[in-house]
Amino acid sequence: MTNLRKTHPLMKIINHSFIDLPAPSNISAWWNFGSLLGACLIIQILTGFFLAMHYTSDTLTAFSSVAHICRDVNYGWLLRNLHANGASMFFMCLFLHVGRGIYYGSYLYKETWNIGVILLLTVMATAFVGYVLPWGQMSFWGATVITNLLSAIPYIGTTLAEWIWGGFAVDKATLTRFFAFHFILPFIITALAIVHLLFLHETGSNNPSGINPNSDKIPFHPYYTIKDALGLTLLFLTLLLLALFSPDSLGDPDNFSPANPLNTPPHIKPGWYFLFAYAILRSIPNKLGGVLALLASILILLIIPLLHTANQRSMMFRPISQTLFWILTANLITLTWIGGQPVEQPFIIIGQLASMLYFLLILVLMPLAGLFENYMLKPKW
């Protein structure tokens, strides 16, 4: 009798994707983040589903419903802490996954890469609307500041902002629709993730050397299922340590105060995972210019495949590009730090220089480094 996993219509798809999938024999732990992101998504959907059973999306009761979840619901405090810190773990894995893609040239699988960028934008949108739901001070003012950026769009800006708000300011209608968005978007993310995998399995995985691995492949199970299991264990352990011992360390103290439209916090800032983009937004004094820079900071990822000039795919054997990559990483950490600081000197100038360096590295220096490395590899005799 033929093995059921190879003949059953549904099992066959799972088999080709996770069991008999030919995978390069040399992929490192940097290739673990795909499965970790899948695990993060499942955790967020499950914890979010149970939280939604007790949450009320009304401006009068939203804040107290979150307090009720933490105090009165069985293990509600754990659900809330896992969900809030799960978002941080999700973004940490996302940033490392994107970084891996840039370092090893995975962006040359253009369809997979472009779907990945759309996924990143969708996850960011989901996290933003989710941050508003507890209806604390930072939730309300974060929503006000970020949605107000839409009004910078010429002609239609104000109308668009009011359309998103469902009124003339962030209020009950805004909270209700943000809850609806926050509930539906994870399912859209799941669908996009399946498409992402579909495109990846058309080409097969890249590997650290950047060389075609077809001559040396091994089955995904048991080799990489065991490897993924180790990664998942470390992810769950980190998440549990964070959620149980330091659940509020990545949040904002202002969010423990209920939203008050009459009292502006001294320093409005989003979640830590948005701070690099927020710093780029603030580094330009003009409102529309800032919004365009904010969009460009993420959408620039879409043109990275077009900026690849090197003859080698991976940065593994390209020391100049490696150096620039780690400067870019340090620069993004600097931007994240600046985004959390008040708008005063010397933070303003540091933010402006770091923002300029971010675009300079991606658009000019890294493509030039690729060309220079090609020249250095040419025989000179």
Curated annotation (Swiss-Prot):
Q: Where are the transmembrane segments?
A: 33-53, 77-98, 113-133, 178-198, 226-246, 288-308, 320-340, 347-367
Q: Where in the cell is it found?
A: Mitochondrion inner membrane
Q: Which UniProt keywords apply?
A: Electron transport, Heme, Iron, Membrane, Metal-binding, Mitochondrion, Mitochondrion inner membrane, Respiratory chain, Transmembrane, Transmembrane helix, Transport, Ubiquinone
Membrane topology reported for the UniProt record: Multi-pass membrane protein
Matching entries from CDD domains are given as: cytochrome_b_C, Cytochrome_b_N
What's a single GO BP term from this record?
mitochondrial electron transport, ubiquinol to cytochrome c
Q: Which Pfam families match?
A: Cytochrom_B_C, Cytochrome_B
The cofactor(s) it depends on are: heme b
**Which residues hold heme b b562?**
H83, H182
Residues binding a ubiquinone are: H201
* A GO cellular-component term linked to this record: mitochondrial inner membrane
MF-aspect GO terms: metal ion binding; ubiquinol-cytochrome-c reductase activity
Residues involved in heme b b566 binding: H97, H196
Family annotation (InterPro entries): Cyt_b/b6_C, Cyt_b/b6_C_sf, Cyt_b/b6_N, Cytb/b6-like_sf, Cytochrome_b, Cytochrome_b_C_euk/bac, Cytochrome_b_N_euk/bac, Di-haem_cyt_TM
Q: Which SUPFAM superfamilies match?
A: a domain/subunit of cytochrome bc1 complex (Ubiquinol-cytochrome c reductase), Transmembrane di-heme cytochromes
**Manner of cofactor binding, per the entry note:** Binds 2 heme b groups non-covalently.
Origin superkingdom: Eukaryota
Q: Tell me its family.
A: Belongs to the cytochrome b family.
Name the PANTHER family on file. CYTOCHROME B
Remarks, miscellaneous: Heme 1 (or BL or b562) is low-potential and absorbs at about 562 nm, and heme 2 (or BH or b566) is high-potential and absorbs at about 566 nm.
Oligomeric and partner information: The cytochrome bc1 complex contains 11 subunits: 3 respiratory subunits (MT-CYB, CYC1 and UQCRFS1), 2 core proteins (UQCRC1 and UQCRC2) and 6 low-molecular weight proteins (UQCRH/QCR6, UQCRB/QCR7, UQCRQ/QCR8, UQCR10/QCR9, UQCR11/QCR10 and a cleavage product of UQCRFS1). This cytochrome bc1 complex then forms a dimer.
Q: What does this protein do?
A: Component of the ubiquinol-cytochrome c reductase complex (complex III or cytochrome b-c1 complex) that is part of the mitochondrial respiratory chain. The b-c1 complex mediates electron transfer from ubiquinol to cytochrome c. Contributes to the generation of a proton gradient across the mitochondrial membrane that is then used for ATP synthesis.
What is the name of the protein in this document? Cytochrome b
> Which gene carries the instructions for this protein?
MT-CYB
